[in-house]
Amino acid sequence: MIIREVVRPLPGARRLSLLRQRLAYSDSARFWERNYARGATSGSGSYGALAEGKSRFLNTLVRGHAVRSVIEFGCGDGNQLSLADYPRYVGLDVSRSAIALCQRRFADDPAKSFFLYDGTCFTDRAGMFTADLALSLDVVYHLTEDTVFETYLTHLFAAGRRLVVIYSTNEEISDTAPHVRHRHFTPWIEANCPGWALTGVTRGPSPDRARADFFVYERQ
């Protein structure tokens, strides 16, 4: 896989805007709690054609692999989930407001459960939070802190009994907003998640230069 670092000169107005955003930014968890608490959504990737494209891929994968249960680390506002066809589902998120949104939205669905996720307080040696498929959609490139990134992936792969699917960019890209940090994440998984193999990479529906793809891992 070819790695490229995209660095472009920024216009003055955009440079100033990014500076202001960076000064206001504290950490990823607080950013997303503020986002949902003020009524904002999970973003354009969870709506419209992008959301539909992701759901087609995932629903096909779930059927093709006879997946009976899914756990998602980063369920957001639940709009992407509304397009999913999963037999049983557990959604985790760092934002209390996002969890409350999902609990209300899917209150009448007995096959879905939601829990607040805090990586610093999450220990699951008993395997209570596991599923056939562990899912991460548009999350990895929002993990701006190294420790948060590493803890998140450790928990994600521990939760997958058979499959892990990550939808993310996989390259270093500069000049981004402070809540975005594009990473070349696959080498970290190869080095730190033994017993897993990357068995497929499928191009995602995003046309952007910072294109996210589906990375499918299977337990060996």
Q: Can you describe what each PLM-predicted range is?
A:
Residues 138-142:
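Short catalytic micro-motifs in class I SAM-dependent methyltransferases
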Residues 1-129, 146-220:
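Class I (Rossmann-like) S-adenosyl-L-methionine-dependent methyltransferase catalytic domain
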Residues 135:
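A conserved beta-strand element that flanks and buttresses the S-adenosyl-L-methionine
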